[in-house]
Amino acid sequence: MRIRLTFYFLLFAFLFNLNSGYTQNTKSDIFDLGKMWTFEHAPVDYFEKTYGFKATQEWLEDVKLSAIRFGNGCSASFISEDGLVMTNHHCGRGYVSSVTRQGEDLAKNGFYAENLSDERPVPTLWVDQLQKTIDVTKDILSAMDAGTTNEEKAKLKSEKIKEIETKYTTETGLKCNVITFYNGGMYMLYCYKRFNDVRLVFSPENLVAGFGGDPDNFTYPRYDFDCAFFRVYDNGQPLKSKNFFNWSKNGATEGEPLFVIGNPGRTERLKTIAQLEFARDYTVPATLMPLNFLANFLG
């Protein structure tokens, strides 16, 4: 099960007027491009009107700090006040391999730490907690305006991004990155607190975690154990945090609003017509060519 919906990089709708030589009137809905939003643009009025749920600023801040970025591209969550982290097994599988000792087969037999001393440090793993967001669109676009050519504008943009990232990283002590939204329509500065001491707590056997294979990967409900548990340490002790998701024994009920928070790798919902035409005419055919050759060879 892949977490695909998120508040970090979630999108809200834009209306596109496509000029193809004649006037074309189309009705558009605010959610034509999906119900995906960033935290800073969550439609709280819509939540309350449609679901009767009041998403206060305190609630948004709490869930933002409870969700974390796991390694280079997965989602995870704090699920206890002692730094316990839950993520998907396929996100942690490679890290499990890195702490497997001689004579062990953790992929086949799984792993469980009965106490804190049994938890295994993963030297190549970190988690990031989003703590600060700043809209820096005006700063970057203003810097680009000084350029007279596309090359100059691109160079000025890169220089300004580096300047902003360096400034806020130095001032806050956080890891700050400028994130591009809407193909350059908006630039946000995301500042993360990074935790480098992360230890393996539990990982099921690969056969149990991946039961059903890829065909079941896009079904719901899915009957497998695609989860893994780690723990974040701070100064050699389990991290103490007031921001975490409480475990629910009952699960969701019918009609209950459900929010999924995480870190998607990318989205293609806002591609332009030119980009889609290029994909249709070049990218997709180039991808299909070797696949068709292989299919004909095997068949």
Can you say where each PLM-predicted feature lies in the sequence?
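Bacterial Sec-dependent N-terminal signal peptides
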Residues: 1-27
